Swiss-Prot record:
Organism of origin: Leuconostoc citreum (strain KM20)
Binding site for (6S)-NADPHX: N57, N58, G59, A60, D61, G123, V124, G125, L126, N127, N128, T129, D152
GO process terms (BP): deadenylation-independent decapping of nuclear-transcribed mRNA; P-body assembly
Residues noted as binding K(+) in the record, renumbered to the chain: N58, D119, T155
Cofactor note: Binds 1 potassium ion per subunit.
Enzyme class: isomerase
A cellular component annotation (GO) from this entry: P-body
Family, as annotated: Belongs to the NnrE/AIBP family.
Organism superkingdom: Bacteria
Gene: nnrE
Identification of the protein by name: NAD(P)H-hydrate epimerase
Length: 222
């Protein structure tokens, strides 16, 4: 089974963008479209979709997902988690796009109103314990047991070890990109990730790349 750690996934991302020449915004769009495909193919209640987006590239994916849902006529709310001034350039670009589309960001969203939550707060780049405020928000979302689709990996899960970094959103489905992550098969990561679906978004492997060898038990590939 082809599995990668967080560092290996970042290596693959960098190689695809910097050496192959694939623009990052193309990867973001492909990632977003793959999540839209899963949402459309699943038996989810789509009456009110809440997208939670963070400061990094995972958040950029989430913003693009919200835009695609919005343009398809879905009732979607986008809540940005974190200080916008600290967001990556990819996030700033996606925020500018949604403003031009007329999608207004919600300052605060009520989890109780959402029928589906898309988790795009933190991806494989998470390497610290989540801030206390975010941990509190995650625990509140888990408490009301909403259906969650995680983008690449549930927020709070270490992509290499599967351990929880303070708190983690429990996902019904995780749409992960390129290759499955070791952390989605190990420790509590295998439980909290739910049904894992691997989507090809055009990532390419560096020469002589070697996959991490682990035997997962919850992987679904498409």
């Amino acid at each position: 089974m082809q599995l990668v750690t967080a560092a290996e996934m970042q290596q693959i991302d960098s190689y695809t963008i910097e050496t192959i020449g694939m623009p990052q915004n193309v990867l973001i769009e492909r990632a977003a479209m793959s999540v839209i495909d899963v949402i459309g193919a699943g038996h989810f209640n789509l009456d009110h979709i809440l997208v939670l987006a963070g400061l990094g590239n995972n958040g950029a994916d989430g913003i693009a997902i919200a835009r695609l849902l919005y343009t398809q006529g879905f009732n979607v709310s986008l809540q940005f988690v974190g200080n916008v001034s600290r967001a990556k350039a990819s996030v700033q670009q996606q925020l500018q796009i949604i403003e031009n589309y007329g999608l207004i960001r919600a300052e605060k969203s009520d989890f109780n109103e959402a029928t589906l939550i898309v988790d795009a707060i933190f991806g494989v780049g998470l390497n610290n314990t989540l801030p206390e405020g975010l941990q509190k928000m995650i625990k509140a979302a888990n408490h009301i047991e909403k259906t969650v689709i995680a983008v690449d990996i549930p927020t709070g899960i270490d992509a290499t070890t599967g351990e929880v970094r303070g708190a983690a959103l429990k996902a019904h489905t995780t749409v992960t990109f390129g290759y499955n992550k070791v952390g989605l098969t190990q420790n509590v990561g295998g439980y909290l990730s739910g049904n894992v679906i691997v989507k090809d978004i055009g990532l390419r492997l560096p020469e002589d790349f070697t996959f991490t060898t682990v035997t997962p038990d919850n992987i679904a590939t498409t």
